[in-house]
Structures are given as C-alpha cells and as structure tokens.
Amino acid sequence: MAQNVNNIKDHVDLFHQPEYQELFENKKQFEGMPTAEKVQEVAEWTKSWEYREKNFAREALTVNPAKACQPLGALLAAIGFEGTLPFVHGSQGCVAYFRTHLTRHFKEPVSAVSSSMTENAAVFGGLKNMVDGLQNSYALYKPKMIAVCTTCMAEVIGDDLGAFLGNARQDGVIPDDLPVPFAHTPSFVGSHITGYDSMMKSILSTLTEGKKKETTNGKINFIAGFETYIGNVRAIKNIISAFDLEGTLLSDTEMYLDSPNLGEFKMYHEGTSLEDAADSINAEATVTLQTYTTPKTREYIEKKWGQKTYTYRPWGVKGTDEFLMGLSELTGKPIPKEFEIARGRAVDAMTDTQAWVHGKRAAVYGDPDLVMGLLQFMLEMGIEPVHVLVNNSTKEFEEEAKALLAASPYGQQATVWGGKDLWHMRSLLFTEPVDFLVGNSYAKYLQRDTKTPLIRIGYPIFDRHHLHRYSTIGYEGAINLLNWIANGLMDELDRKTDTPSVTDISFDLVR
C-alpha cells in the first residue's frame, strides 16, 4: 500500500510507488501512447532549425502565452484603493482564476466577487446577475467603492455595463453616492496590462466626475503601473518621503498584498484614500513608472485634467539617476543625501561582481516595461541580451527596445521578438543557446527542456517564496537584480563542477 498512517508520503515520493507506476502504465496503454523511442525522436526534432522555422511560421495558434487576461490587471488596480471591492461581471470560474493567480504570487488573500453568469445569462444577458450581485455585495461587504470589470462571456454578448449600473441605481440596490467605476476588459484582446490601464482610467474618471481643476494642491501623483514587487511600492513611498513631497500614490497595494499577520482578518486594507484619489485632479503633475501599462490613463490625465505627465523607468543606476534628477527638477528640491550613499553602494556592488556577468549571453521575456528595465540593467553590466521576447508587445515598445540595444555595444546580437510565446522561446534556446534565461515561473519548463539556467524575475512567481517582497527599481533594486543574476550563475557553475576528480578542479570556495 502506497500510503499508511505510519508512513505518510508527500506527492514527490507518492507517485513513484508501484501502484501509481502501474496506473500510469495502464493509462498509456489505454490511450495508445507512442513508444518512448518515438517520443524521444520527435522531441529531438523539436530542437532543430527545421522545427524552429515551422514553429515561427504558425499564425493562428498560441502555445504557452507569456501574458494573462485583462481582468487580472483590473483587479490589481482596484485593490490598491481604500475599501474597494472588485466585481467581475462574468462566470465564477474566471474570478477564481484571477484571485488564485494573484494569491499564489503574493501569498495573500485577494477578495473579489462575481456576477456568477451561467448559460442562461449568456443567452439572455447578465442584467439580473449584475443587479443581484451588486445588491448582495454591498449588503454583505460594505465597500466604499465597487470596481466592475468584465470577462469574455459578458463581452461576447455585448452587455452594457453603464446601462446595467443605471438600472441598479434606479432599483435602489446600491446608493446613488457609491462610486462604481467600470471597465470593459475582454480577454480576447490585449492582456493584463491593458486591463490595469482601463480600470485605472475608469477609477480616476469616476472619482473626479463633474470636477474641474480649480487650484493646485501642491502634490505629485505617482502611478506604479502593473507592479508585482511590493518592495517597489515601498521604494516609491520612501522616495516621496525622502524628498519631503506631498505625494499621492494612485493604487497603493502595499498593505493589501503584504499585510502583517496580527491575528485578525481584514477584508480591506489602507490603500489610496478615495478623497486623495478624487483630489488628484488638482495635483501639480503625475509621474508614471511604466510606459506601456498606462497609455490611456496618461492620455486622460493630460487631455481631461490638463495636467502634465512624466514617465520614468528607474531600473539600474542610469535609470534611477534620471528618475531622481527629474523629480528634483520637477519639485525644485535637491536630491537627498541618502540616495548618493545608496548609489555608491550599488556602484560598489556592480564593480565587485561585473567580472562574473560581463559578456554573458541572456534571453529575457516578460511585460514590455519589465523587459525594458531589465535591458537597461543588463547593458549597464555588460550582459549581452540575445533573445528579447514580449508576448503582449506593441510597435512602440519594439522600436524603443531596438533603439536601446542598438546604442550599446552589448546589444548588437539581440533580436526583439514581439507577439511571440514561450514555445517560440523554446526553439530560440535550442537553436541559439544562451548562458541564462530571465523570466517568471513558467520558464521552469524551458529550463527543464533546454537546461538553460533560470533567473526568476517577473510575474507570476509561484514556485519560489517571498521574491515579491524585494525591490527591482532604484539603487537597492539594482543590487537585488545583480544578486539574483550573479548568484544564479554561480549556483550553475557549482552544479557543473561538483563531480570529484572530474570537474571539481573549479569547485571553488571563493568566487
């Protein structure tokens, strides 16, 4: 018997027991699986240039996408505001996916509700589901704001959110003064960063509805973007504090996604107050830290509010320098001394380690802004990006990435692959191998197949704990990036040199 009360096996050992091995073998026979030799033959063929050409010729199929659905980003934008309950107009299964996708990365509960659309609603429309859902949500959870987004089902049948919300208010199921921003977030176009942008724009337009810029409040607005490193949220707030600024971080997710365990459950955490968000229309300017996550929001702020927006990417030393100098120029305040010290530490760390990473060939994938930040840092360290892949790419991103790479001697061998997926990346790694790969947890399958060392940076990271608590921006973030990359390469070097009397001549204690 595989399991007994005196010897409980976990899943790592359990499925290697004879009973399960026999079950798996019977399953293969039942399904008529090809022989192991045939499987190996085809697997070897998929590593070839011939297969790569066929792989890159496909048009109507995505295999292992490096992006997520729009509502996921909408949820992340919404939970950063005080007392806000995300409401997804669609099926329960979709909402469960979004919640677990965030929870598995942050290791924190993420609250969201659904209108629970089923087959009937798909045929006759989801009005009743939304009205009932809003009534129950407000009665049970007492939110200060309900942020509504949609799934594919609601979008395919063309449900009119504005009209539905009007009916709900007319029926008296939610108060007239309850803010209910809504965003259409169809997952068959765009990605999670599109959903973030749509929801952020909707929240700001709803909270400032009917207002006009009257006078400056002396504040600076900050938008982090689709930010999955809570250390970065803290870094932004630390910069605001160090400059002694009156600043408003629009969608402050720090306490929601990294809350202390004090023995009492809180459904809502601090976040950006609705009053501060409503007053953001009167700020001096808005600073965004991601270009391709907030295009509609920035356009809205510039055109509707008549407010200037500035975009910075504080990755690596140069990017952080530009951000701090830009902030100093914008506010008229000097750069605090503490950042000079932090910069010196980053430069010192980079000097200590550059010999171990200089000239290393890398592959990288992720969201456009994440990849641009990583490229900035890699080029500073003399790392040579070879494969740059962004599934949710844009023409503007590709032009910017190519210009950045062309301007550096270390970017001359790089190719930017826009709109490609992780099965494309697999072909690239087999046909043009690199020294390491930077990506999220889904890259572990690429690591297993191609034996390319993986440095986990991005979202989601499901199979390692607490990386989201670190920063990737600022001078401290540069040290973290250097730490992960350099030590990952050294771990791989140890693995390659650990055979006594064969490879261990380079199994060094000091590196």
Swiss-Prot record:
Top-level taxonomic group: Bacteria
A Pfam family recorded for this sequence: Oxidored_nitro
EC class name: oxidoreductase
GO biological-process terms attached to the record: nitrogen fixation
NCBIfam families: nifK
GO cellular component: molybdenum-iron nitrogenase complex
Keyword annotations: ATP-binding, Iron, Iron-sulfur, Metal-binding, Nitrogen fixation, Nucleotide-binding, Oxidoreductase
Name of the molecule in the record: Nitrogenase molybdenum-iron protein beta chain
Upper lineage: Bacteria, Bacillati, Cyanobacteriota, Cyanophyceae, Oscillatoriophycideae
Subunit structure, interactors included: Tetramer of two alpha and two beta chains. Forms complex with the iron protein (nitrogenase component 2).
Function: This molybdenum-iron protein is part of the nitrogenase complex that catalyzes the key enzymatic reactions in nitrogen fixation.
MF annotations from Gene Ontology: ATP binding; iron-sulfur cluster binding; metal ion binding; nitrogenase activity
Protein encoded by which gene: nifK
Cofactor(s), by name: [8Fe-7S] cluster
Family that this chain belongs to: Belongs to the NifD/NifK/NifE/NifN family.
Cofactor note text: Binds 1 [8Fe-7S] cluster per heterodimer.
Residues binding [8Fe-7S] cluster, per UniProt: 69, 94, 152, 187
Reactions mediated catalytically: N2 + 8 reduced [2Fe-2S]-[ferredoxin] + 16 ATP + 16 H2O = H2 + 8 oxidized [2Fe-2S]-[ferredoxin] + 2 NH4(+) + 16 ADP + 16 phosphate + 6 H(+)
UniProt xrefs under InterPro entries: ChlB/BchB/BchZ (IPR050152), Nase/OxRdtase_comp1 (IPR000510), Nase_comp1_CS (IPR000318), Nase_Mo-Fe_CF_bsu (IPR005976), Nase_Mo-Fe_CF_bsu_N (IPR024564)
